[in-house]
Amino acid sequence: MFQGFTPEAVEFLWGIKFNNNREWFLPRKEQFLALVDRPMRELGSELFDAIAAEYPKQSLKLHVCRIYRDARRLFGRGPYKDHLWFTIERPHERFEGVPALYFELAPNYFSYGCGYWDASPATMAKLRRRIETNPKPLEKIVRKLNKSRFTLTGQPFKRPKGDVGKLLNPWYNAKNIAVGYDDNPEGVLFTPELKDEVLAGFRELMPLYLYLDSLAGDPEANKE
């Protein structure tokens, strides 16, 4: 049962950030498993069970990231990730192809939200066409989100794609879509109540998740 992370877990992630090498990590691997990996998996499993029970038709799965970076993509960085996360999403072949609910823990923050890791141009074209042809469903979602703790984090195009009004312009002109809430690694992070907070957030975000996930069923939009 998830009991919260600990200050030692945050300190461990700082340790990886400044000592990202096998010589530092390997003698401390058991610490990593106890302090970071185990509570991350407990939190993810309990949140997944709750969301999957409420949305049984969605065929969701839980994915907890591994600490090891892809050796083909180190680009001069160390072999270990200094921030870890899990996602709740439907099964897929390409990780950028579907939206997800996520929780992330880093040395200097924790975060949770919903969106794409890296939405494809085709997916974003489908979203823009939805906004053009039937904006009301997304307008309803965005109005509620604008009153919540979550903020849109998608990077905008340097040259806007168009003007669809103040409410949806940030969504229409984004290269990628994600909304999230960031907090300092303290307080509720170190308590069992973190699960309740994140679960409430996930429930609040499910209308957005379902909307984004439904884009996969739209026909390809015309090239712009």
Residue ranges, per PLM feature:
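Long, solvent-exposed, polar/charged low-complexity segments
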Residues: 1-15, 44, 131-132, 136, ...
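Active-site acidic/histidine clusters and adjacent loop/turn architecture
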Residues: 14-67
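Short histidine-centered catalytic/ligand-binding loop motif
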Residues: 29-36, 116, 126-131, 190-194
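Long, hydrophobic, amphipathic alpha-helical segments used as structural scaffolds
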Residues: 47, 51, 55, 142, ...
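A short, surface-exposed loop/turn module that caps and links secondary-structure elements
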Residues: 53-80, 84, 149-162
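Sequence-level motif detector for i,i+2 pairs with an aromatic at +2
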Residues: 62, 81, 109, 174-176
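Aromatic- and glycine-enriched beta-alpha-beta binding-site module
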Residues: 72-132
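Compact, glycine/acidic-enriched structural inserts
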Residues: 106-164
